[in-house]
């Protein structure tokens, strides 16, 4: 069993912890929090040993009825690998600790590529991970882009990508962020950071991205245009998506035309935390013009799509499963991830 420490038990960390616990070849040996919070109570309910950075705060946790297993360094020493799910920028500060302890670690998309030196996506570059001490799972938006670009590049070749990210303003529980009544260019200059982030995994892809933030919390929405190298049809493209375990199709017959309706659908499916781990490509939007111009809309659940990637990254870094498709199958099966549509 791979012993996994989750350093940072927040939006991503709590999901990765549950995903690790569901795997047949992994176990959660601890999670970390900096202060008493709702997530700390969830960790207690899940039975995850809770570690804190500052043992001076231990009385506050104990007063709240939450047992502290020790400090974060003790958790790290007991682990085979660390998933660093701390806020953006904190992972960079944590890296020297992992280096000192000789631990493999996975960072999230909030960190720069240079923090790990290797950015990861299970379908695109799984086999390149094994000889690295560190890896970075690209951001939620970049994960969604890499999945769909890589799938079409493998099938038809991709000459060029132009994509617009319509980004949610905040996560549902993040009451400190906005906007409440505005559309904010993010940034006003072109490109946004998403294209260069995609290039850390798919360096050969010509991609330009634009982004804006809107007053919603449920998901991001992408408007994507690709120039393909080979002529194809809409039907052939849909077959590629149907055969991809992490690209779901929002069928026209579902009547879903918004992120809110899609979230309701995942809730009705009984998905944990209403998570959409896969891309949600709107079938009705999938178009091929003049044989080589591809268009679509896709929804990306910012809290969830990187979760299975973290699980595969654990196996890839540890070298325990050599075949990417086998790891992906194991991860999906344990999570109950059957792509919608």
Swiss-Prot record:
<feature type="binding site">
    <location>
        <begin position="139"/>
        <end position="141"/>
    </location>
    <ligand>
        <name>D-glyceraldehyde 3-phosphate</name>
    </ligand>
</feature>
<dbReference type="Pfam" id="PF02800">
    <property type="entry name" value="Gp_dh_C"/>
</dbReference>
<protein>
    <recommendedName>
        <fullName>Glyceraldehyde-3-phosphate dehydrogenase</fullName>
        <ecNumber>1.2.1.59</ecNumber>
    </recommendedName>
</protein>
<comment type="similarity">
    <text>Belongs to the glyceraldehyde-3-phosphate dehydrogenase family.</text>
</comment>
<dbReference type="InterPro" id="IPR006436">
    <property type="entry name" value="Glyceraldehyde-3-P_DH_2_arc"/>
</dbReference>
<dbReference type="InterPro" id="IPR000846">
    <property type="entry name" value="DapB_N"/>
</dbReference>
<dbReference type="GO" id="GO:0047100">
    <property type="term" value="F:glyceraldehyde-3-phosphate dehydrogenase (NADP+) (phosphorylating) activity"/>
</dbReference>
<dbReference type="InterPro" id="IPR020829">
    <property type="entry name" value="GlycerAld_3-P_DH_cat"/>
</dbReference>
<comment type="pathway">
    <text>Carbohydrate degradation; glycolysis; pyruvate from D-glyceraldehyde 3-phosphate: step 1/5.</text>
</comment>
<dbReference type="GO" id="GO:0006096">
    <property type="term" value="P:glycolytic process"/>
</dbReference>
<feature type="binding site">
    <location>
        <position position="110"/>
    </location>
    <ligand>
        <name>NAD(+)</name>
    </ligand>
</feature>
<feature type="binding site">
    <location>
        <begin position="194"/>
        <end position="195"/>
    </location>
    <ligand>
        <name>D-glyceraldehyde 3-phosphate</name>
    </ligand>
</feature>
<feature type="binding site">
    <location>
        <position position="168"/>
    </location>
    <ligand>
        <name>NAD(+)</name>
    </ligand>
</feature>
<feature type="binding site">
    <location>
        <begin position="11"/>
        <end position="12"/>
    </location>
    <ligand>
        <name>NAD(+)</name>
    </ligand>
</feature>
<dbReference type="GO" id="GO:0009089">
    <property type="term" value="P:lysine biosynthetic process via diaminopimelate"/>
</dbReference>
<dbReference type="GO" id="GO:0008839">
    <property type="term" value="F:4-hydroxy-tetrahydrodipicolinate reductase"/>
</dbReference>
<dbReference type="GO" id="GO:0004365">
    <property type="term" value="F:glyceraldehyde-3-phosphate dehydrogenase (NAD+) (phosphorylating) activity"/>
</dbReference>
<dbReference type="InterPro" id="IPR020831">
    <property type="entry name" value="GlycerAld/Erythrose_P_DH"/>
</dbReference>
<keyword id="KW-0521">NADP</keyword>
<feature type="binding site">
    <location>
        <position position="302"/>
    </location>
    <ligand>
        <name>NAD(+)</name>
    </ligand>
</feature>
<keyword id="KW-0963">Cytoplasm</keyword>
<keyword id="KW-0324">Glycolysis</keyword>
<dbReference type="InterPro" id="IPR036291">
    <property type="entry name" value="NAD(P)-bd_dom_sf"/>
</dbReference>
<dbReference type="InterPro" id="IPR020828">
    <property type="entry name" value="GlycerAld_3-P_DH_NAD(P)-bd"/>
</dbReference>
<dbReference type="GO" id="GO:0005737">
    <property type="term" value="C:cytoplasm"/>
</dbReference>
<feature type="active site" description="Nucleophile">
    <location>
        <position position="140"/>
    </location>
</feature>
<dbReference type="Pfam" id="PF01113">
    <property type="entry name" value="DapB_N"/>
</dbReference>
<comment type="subunit">
    <text>Homotetramer.</text>
</comment>
<keyword id="KW-0560">Oxidoreductase</keyword>
<dbReference type="GO" id="GO:0050661">
    <property type="term" value="F:NADP binding"/>
</dbReference>
<keyword id="KW-0520">NAD</keyword>
<dbReference type="GO" id="GO:0051287">
    <property type="term" value="F:NAD binding"/>
</dbReference>
């Amino acid at each position: 069993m791979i012993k996994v420490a989750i350093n940072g038990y927040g939006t991503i960390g709590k999901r990765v912890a549950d995903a690790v616990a569901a795997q047949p070849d992994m176990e959660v040996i601890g999670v970390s929090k900096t202060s008493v919070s709702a997530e700390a109570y969830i960790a207690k309910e899940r039975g995850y040993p809770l570690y804190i950075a500052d043992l001076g705060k231990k009385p506050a946790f104990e007063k709240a009825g939450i047992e502290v297993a020790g400090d974060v360094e003790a958790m790290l020493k007991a682990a085979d690998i660390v998933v660093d799910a701390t806020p953006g920028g904190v992972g960079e500060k944590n890296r020297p600790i992992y280096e000192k302890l000789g631990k493999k670690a996975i960072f999230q998309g909030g960190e720069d590529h240079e923090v790990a030196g290797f950015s990861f996506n299970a379908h695109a570059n799984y086999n390149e991970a094994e000889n690295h001490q560190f890896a970075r799972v690209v951001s939620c938006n970049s994960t969604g882009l890499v999945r769909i670009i890589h799938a079409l590049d493998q099938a038809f070749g991709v000459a060029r990508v132009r994509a617009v990210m319509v980004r949610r303003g905040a996560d549902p529980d993040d009451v400190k962020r906005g906007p409440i009544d505005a559309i904010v260019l993010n940034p006003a200059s072109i490109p946004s950071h998403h294209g260069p982030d995609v290039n850390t995994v798919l360096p050969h892809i010509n991609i330009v991205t634009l982004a804006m933030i809107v007053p919603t919390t449920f998901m991001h929405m992408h408007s994507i245009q690709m120039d393909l190298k080979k002529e194809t049809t809409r039907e052939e493209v849909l077959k590629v998506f149907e055969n991809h375990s992490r690209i779901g199709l929002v069928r026209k017959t579902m009547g879903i035309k918004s992120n809110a309706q899609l979230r309701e659908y995942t809730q009705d499916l009984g998905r944990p935390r209403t998570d959409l781990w896969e891309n949600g490509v709107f079938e009705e939007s999938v178009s091929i013009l003049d044989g080589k111009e591809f268009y679509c809309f896709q929804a990306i659940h910012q809290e969830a799509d990187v979760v299975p990637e973290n699980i595969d990254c654990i196996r890839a870094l540890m070298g325990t499963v050599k075949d990417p498709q086998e790891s992906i199958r194991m991860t999906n099966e344990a999570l109950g991830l059957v792509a919608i549509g």
